[in-house]
Amino acid sequence: MGYDVTRFQGDVDEDLICPICSGVLEEPVQAPHCEHAFCNACITQWFSQQQTCPVDRSVVTVAHLRPVPRIMRNMLSKLQIACDNAVFGCSAVVRLDNLMSHLSDCEHNPKRPVTCEQGCGLEMPKDELPNHNCIKHLRSVVQQQQSRIAELEKTSAEHKHQLAEQKRDIQLLKAYMRAIRSVNPNLQNLEETIEYNEILEWVNSLQPARVTRWGGMISTPDAVLQAVIKRSLVESGCPASIVNELIENAHERSWPQGLATLETRQMNRRYYENYVAKRIPGKQAVVVMACENQHMGDDMVQEPGLVMIFAHGVEEI
C-alpha cells in the first residue's frame, strides 16, 4: 500500500500517485504497454481477482510487470516525508529514500530495539520496556538453563553407564582371549593378522606426502607438540594398538641408528627421498611406516613406524 499523501511536504505529482490506493507509490512497478504505475502490493492484490490493468482494462499479468523508469524513481526519492513516528512525537521530515534508515534509528520508534539497563541486559522493543520485569525474565532464563542442565546430566549419566558396561565387556573379552590363547596358540597369529590388516587399512587411508625441507625436522618435540600429533593420529583412525608406539617414535631417542644423531642424519640425508611417507592430516608431520618401507635398511626404519615432525615443508602428493 502507498504512503499517505498528507505526510508529504508540498504537492505531489499525480504521476506518482497509485491509481489503486490513491497513496504515493511504494515499491512501484509498471505495466509495460500502457505504462501505468502501481504500488507493488496493490497491483499484486488486484491481480488475485483479475488479470487486467486497473486503469484501462488492458490484459496484464504479474509476469508482465517491470520496475518504473529511473526518472520516476528519482522523483519519488526526492519527496520530503514526515516520519512514521510523528504520532509518537517525532518531528523529522526526511527524503523518501532515507526514510528506512531514519526509522531504524528514530528515538520515537516504539519498536526500536533497546537494552534493559536495570541489570538483565535483555533487548526488546521500546514500547515493551515500561512493562518489563527483570526478575521475571531472569527467572525464565534460569529455569531454561536448569532444564537444559538436567537434560545434559541425564545424558552424561547414560553415557557413563554405557562406557562402564563397554569397559567391563572389553575386560571380559580380553580375559576370554587370554584363556583361549593358552589352549590354542594359533589364536595369537590370528590376532596379529587382524591387527596388521587394521594398520594397513589406516595407512592406505592417509595421503602420500613429500618433504621438501628435511632440514626443518623437529627431532626432540616437547610433550605439548607430541600431544597435538597424537590427537591427530587418533582422529585419523590410527589403531589404538600402535598410537603410543608411534608417538614414542616421534623423538630421536627412539629412532634407529641411521637417524639417532644429527651427524648420522646429515650423513644419511641422501636416502630420505626413498622413504614412503604419509601425511598426518592437518599437520606438518608424516608417518614412515615399517610395512611400507621394507626397502629401507634396518638402520633407517623402526617398528611399527616413525613419526617425523617438521617446522614446514610437508606437502601432499
From Swiss-Prot:
A zinc finger (RING-type) spans 18-57. GO terms for molecular function: erythropoietin receptor binding; identical protein binding; interleukin-3 receptor binding; protein domain specific binding; receptor tyrosine kinase binding; small GTPase binding; ubiquitin protein ligase activity; ubiquitin-protein transferase activity. The keyword Zinc-finger applies. Pfam families: USP8_interact, zf-C3HC4_2. PROSITE patterns: ZF_RING_1, ZF_RING_2, ZF_SIAH. GO terms for biological process: autophagy; extrinsic apoptotic signaling pathway; negative regulation of cell migration; negative regulation of cell population proliferation; negative regulation of mitophagy; positive regulation of protein catabolic process; positive regulation of reactive oxygen species metabolic process; proteasomal protein catabolic process. Autoubiquitinated. Autoubiquitination leads to proteasomal degradation. Deubiquitinated by USP8 to get stabilized which induces apoptosis. Interacts with USP8, ERBB3, PRKN and BIRC6. Interacts with CSF2RB, EPOR, IL3RA, MYD88 and TBK1. Interacts with Clec16a. One of its GO terms (cellular component) is perinuclear region of cytoplasm. A zinc finger (SIAH-type) spans 78-138. Pathway: Protein modification; protein ubiquitination. It catalyses: S-ubiquitinyl-[E2 ubiquitin-conjugating enzyme]-L-cysteine + [acceptor protein]-L-lysine = [E2 ubiquitin-conjugating enzyme]-L-cysteine + N(6)-ubiquitinyl-[acceptor protein]-L-lysine. Keywords: Apoptosis, Autophagy, Metal-binding, Transferase, Ubl conjugation, Ubl conjugation pathway, Zinc, Zinc-finger. This is E3 ubiquitin-protein ligase NRDP1. Acts as E3 ubiquitin-protein ligase and regulates the degradation of target proteins. Polyubiquitinates MYD88. Negatively regulates MYD88-dependent production of pro-inflammatory cytokines. Can promote TRIF-dependent production of type I interferon and inhibits infection with vesicular stomatitis virus. Also promotes activation of TBK1 and IRF3. Involved in the ubiquitination of erythropoietin (EPO) and interleukin-3 (IL-3) receptors. It comes from Mus musculus (Mouse). The gene is Rnf41. Its EC number is 2.3.2.27.
